[in-house]
C-alpha cells in the first residue's frame, strides 16, 4: 500500500477502475464508491467500527466485492489549514492498512464535507434519525466527489479519457 497524491493516483489508475471514498469516524467508517468512469460518487452503507482488525477486514471485503482500485480518505484539517485532532488517527489507520492491502490511498482535505452532507440531507427532507445513519457515507461521497472532480480536470489537461 502506498500513499499517493491525487496526481500520482491519476497516473496509476487504468481506465474503468473504480475508487472508494472513506470518512473515518470514531464509531463508523463512511463509504462511497465511484462509477467505472470515475465521474460520480455514490454513498454506500457504513462500516460500524469495532476494532482495527475487524474494521480492516470489513473494508477489504468491501474493496474486493466492489473491485476497488484505490481509496480516497478524508483528512480532517482545521479551517486554518492546520492538522485537526483526528489527522493523527487517520494517518495511523492508513499506516496500519499497509499490512492489509497493496491498494493506494490518497488523503483528501475533508473540511466542511460533513456540513455539506448534512445540508444536502436536510434539503432532501431526510428525518433526523435517518440523517444520523447516512451522514458518514454522505460525507464520504463529498470527499470522493472532490477527488473525482480533480481527476477529471487532470484528465482534461492531459487530453486523456477515463472510459
UniProtKB/Swiss-Prot annotation:
Name of protein: Putative pre-16S rRNA nuclease
Record keyword Hydrolase present: yes
One Pfam family recorded for the sequence: RuvX
Keyword Nuclease: yes
Coarse class of the protein's main subcellular location: cytoplasm
NCBIfam families linked: RNAse_H_YqgF
SMART domains linked: YqgFc
Keywords: Cytoplasm, Hydrolase, Nuclease, Ribosome biogenesis
Family to which this protein belongs: Belongs to the YqgF nuclease family.
EC number: 3.1.-.-
GO CC terms in record: cytosol
Role of this protein: Could be a nuclease involved in processing of the 5'-end of pre-16S rRNA.
PANTHER family registered for this protein in UniProt: POLYNUCLEOTIDYL TRANSFERASE, RIBONUCLEASE H-LIKE SUPERFAMILY PROTEIN
GO terms (BP aspect): rRNA 5'-end processing
MF-aspect GO terms: nuclease activity
Organism listed in the record: Rhizobium leguminosarum bv. trifolii (strain WSM2304)
Subcellular location: Cytoplasm
InterPro entries: RNaseH-like_sf, YqgF, YqgF/RNaseH-like_dom, YqgF/RNaseH-like_dom_sf
Amino acid at each position: 500500500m502506498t500513499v499517493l497524491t491525487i496526481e500520482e493516483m491519476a497516473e496509476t489508475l487504468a481506465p474503468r477502475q473504480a475508487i472508494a471514498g472513506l470518512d473515518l469516524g470514531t464509531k463508523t467508517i463512511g463509504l462511497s464508491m465511484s462509477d467505472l468512469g470515475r465521474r460520480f460518487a455514490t454513498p454506500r452503507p457504513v462500516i460500524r467500527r469495532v476494532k482495527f482488525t475487524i474494521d480492516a477486514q470489513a473494508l477489504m471485503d468491501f474493496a474486493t466485492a466492489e473491485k476497488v482500485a484505490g481509496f480516497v480518505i478524508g483528512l480532517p484539517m482545521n479551517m486554518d489549514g492546520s492538522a485537526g485532532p483526528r489527522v493523527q488517527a487517520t494517518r495511523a489507520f492508513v499506516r496500519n492498512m499497509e499490512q492489509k492491502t497493496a491498494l493506494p490511498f490518497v488523503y483528501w482535505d475533508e473540511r466542511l464535507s460533513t456540513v455539506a452532507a448534512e445540508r444536502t440531507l436536510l434539503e432532501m427532507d431526510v428525518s433526523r434519525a435517518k440523517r444520523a445513519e447516512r451522514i458518514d457515507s454522505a460525507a464520504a461521497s463529498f470527499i470522493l466527489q472532490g477527488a473525482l472532480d480533480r481527476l477529471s480536470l487532470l484528465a482534461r489537461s492531459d487530453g486523456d479519457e477515463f472510459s
